[in-house]
Amino acid sequence: MKQRNSAILSYGRTIRKATANDVSLIMDFIRQGRAKMIAAGNVNQWSDKHPSRQTIEKDIAQGTSYLLCENDTPIATFALLAGPEPTYSYIEGGRWLDDQPYYVIHRVASVEGVHGVVSDIIAYCLSLTSTIRIDTHADNYPMQAVLKRSGFNYCGIIYLEDGSQRQAYQLSL
């Protein structure tokens, strides 16, 4: 992935690829993220088994796992994968904005008490691509609000491999 232009992140924040040494830290971010979702009433999006350590290790091995750092200290994680995303091939109740090549953001999680994480992740991703797709659970109201504020368009419902529904969004510049 070649950077198209510089990402403008919040002051003191940078993005770096995750390494095998970061797995435990990322799993801690995921535990904190799961707890935040449950506290906000979203008990269904991430089960105790998802995302798994194996998934995170695979993301790292494939070079798709990233850390958002503040003053060189990791504060959040996400995966950025080149499309096509297999579960995005069928969309119900709507349609994708276009058929252009895209990247997908998955597995966003952060430490407790930090703000602007998703906005910084989106800014970074837009330095690499002009089209981003993302999905989230219907009960994940905070993520839906951030996506709408960031200019994403709701496109419809997609189904994960296990049959779970997710709301699908796309941003195309």
Residue ranges and their predicted role:
Residues 128-139:
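Conserved GNAT acetyl-CoA-binding A-motif
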Residues 13-28:
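A short beta-loop-alpha structural element at the N-terminal edge
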Residues 139-156:
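Conserved active-site alpha-helix within GNAT-family acetyltransferase domains
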Residues 135, 153-167:
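Conserved catalytic-core motifs of GNAT/GCN5-like acyltransferases
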Residues 35-54:
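Conserved GNAT-fold acetyl-CoA-binding loop/helix
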Residues 67, 73-83:
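Conserved beta-strand in the GNAT
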Residues 79-113:
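Conserved acyl-donor/pantetheine-binding loop and adjacent beta-alpha core of acyl/acetyltransferases
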Residues 110-127, 145-149:
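Conserved acetyl-CoA-binding loop-helix of GNAT-fold acetyltransferases
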